[in-house]
Amino acid sequence: MGTLLLVHAHPDDECVATGGVMLRAHQEGHRVVLVTATRGEEGEIHNMDEASTRPRLGEVRTEELRRSCEILGVDRQEFLGYRDSGMAGTASNQDPRSFHRAPLSEAAGRLAVLLREERPDVVVTYTPDGTYGHPDHVKAHHVTVAALDLLEREGWRPAKAYLHA
């Protein structure tokens, strides 16, 4: 069986965009690897007390991601180690730790390490516009393409790379 590696920006993106693909791949016996750029620290809070949850939102969303990975049959989940950039035009966009401000070569290098380790048959990430323009989704697309370009120059590429809408 093969390996499917997906690159997402935040916890919950895996469910919203590719949950069905991930579960089916797992059910068919494929290895499923999820790379998440951030811990979703700037996400929206719908069903919890914002004042008490906001300071620990990254922890909350990391736990939600862990549970999601269990349900979807993810074999390995790794973070790239960046901070959620928030929506375009927000103050969080200016945080130097935010994903969308990360140097492309640095972030692509981090992803390339995981790609080298896994040698996936299929890689999935966002369209160039990040599906709806979120700065971290756009960055995830560019980082994935740059990492794949880097590895192709080293003589390797996955059998297929897909962009999800």
Q: What does each model-found stretch correspond to?
A:
Residues 1-118, 145-146:
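Active-site rim/loop-helix segments in enzyme catalytic domains that contact anionic ligands
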Residues 57-60, 139-140, 157:
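Short acidic-hydrophobic sequence patches enriched in Asp/Glu that either
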